[in-house]
Amino acid sequence: MLAGCASVDYSVVEPALYEGAIEELQQELRENPDSAEARRSLGLIYLRTGAFRDARTELQAAYDGGVEDPEALFSLGLAHERSGEQRAAIEAYRRYTDLPRTSRYREPMQGRYLLLARQVARAQVRRALAAEATLTDQAPARHVVGVVPLSYQGREPRFEPLGEGLAEMIAIDLAQVQQLRVVERVRLDAVLDELELGASDVVAVASAPRTGRLLGAGRLVAGTYDVLDEETLRLDAALWEMAEAEEPGVESRTDALEQLFAMQKQLVFSLIERMGIRLTAEERARIGEVPTDDLEAFLEFARGLAFERQGQYTEAAQAFSRAAVQDPSFAQATEAQARAQGMQTATGDAASFQRTTLVPAVGPAPIGAAPLSRRLQELSIGLGADDVPGDPDERRPAPEVSDEPPRLPDPPPPPSN
């Protein structure tokens, strides 16, 4: 693994460790080319030994042949990534929702998916900035809505993250409307970071149209809030129509802080009415659902979102955990905790990610000393060795779960929410 002055890649091991196993698997495939299990095992070995393109080929063939266990799906994404195929890696990692929640591969797959999606979004925003002059001639898509964090006008630090949580709830509610598509947080974060804009900057007359163009959004929801004497909440939300030159209309609400969730719902319904959209009974019912009525849990959730936006995933996971403990029925907090933990696991380049997530290989058994399956287990290839206690049989096709993968920014095709 050493070439000239090149550094050693500690994420892989010497192919000689697997020489006998590779020969046996290749022989098996010559005799039975349709053996998806043999291709799976060979692909896992190639991934461990740095033959990434060969690993991708064999693991894709195994997947096409019906192998859908968590280790194979995880390894397929990693093989694509190590081969420099980012879009294909994203497509593989996005299938983390197909894995059992108890699988040890679900969290790193989710984290890597989100990390690569953020990289893609930032690259797209940079390209859009480079070609910004041409964007002014493009008609904005009115059905696409961006929701930015609300800007805090008060002085009490305890309530400063609340704008993140309010924006997230508004975005979740607007996403229930079939006629609308809400800009993903990953793309929103990329635009705000590249423009070096804070929440207060976005609501400025000069900034909002530019932000909307870069988001590809025909509408932009922004606003301000304040908490007076820790008892009274004032919310002001503006709806920018990018195709119109005039300043936006503002929806305002003032009530007791404990009425936060009712106020947020009222704002959403008013914004939708201002857009001229008539909701179905089903859409109205979904929007009316309140994820939590616990203010402290919601504040912790909002803090987690703020940490997450800053790339502080450990602190974000801790805040989301506190929110979930405060209100165990707060499903968004539980999901966000898993997301932040996945991001924490998935940081770094592909080589360091492989090194920290795959179980290191141990010394090889003597070739010919044991059956192939036993030797693969001893070499930590997987074959069940990495299952966590209580997991269902991960060699069987994983059952689908109810949550859907987050939608990626365009391109890369095709992931959709």
Language-model-detected regions and their locations in the chain:
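Post-signal peptide N-terminal segment of mature Sec-exported envelope proteins
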Residues: 9-41, 45, 49, 64, ...
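Amphipathic beta-strand/beta-sheet edge segments enriched in Tyr/Trp
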Residues: 73, 84, 91-98, 202-276
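Structural signature of tandem alpha-helical TPR/SEL1-like repeats
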Residues: 14-26, 49-61, 83-92, 312-315, ...
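C-terminal/domain-edge helix-coil "capping" segments
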Residues: 8-10, 15-23, 98-100, 105-111, ...
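Short beta-strand->alpha-helix linker/helix-N-cap micro-motif
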Residues: 139-208, 218-233, 244-251, 286, ...
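Conserved structural position within tetratricopeptide repeats
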Residues: 27-31, 61-64, 97-98, 324-325
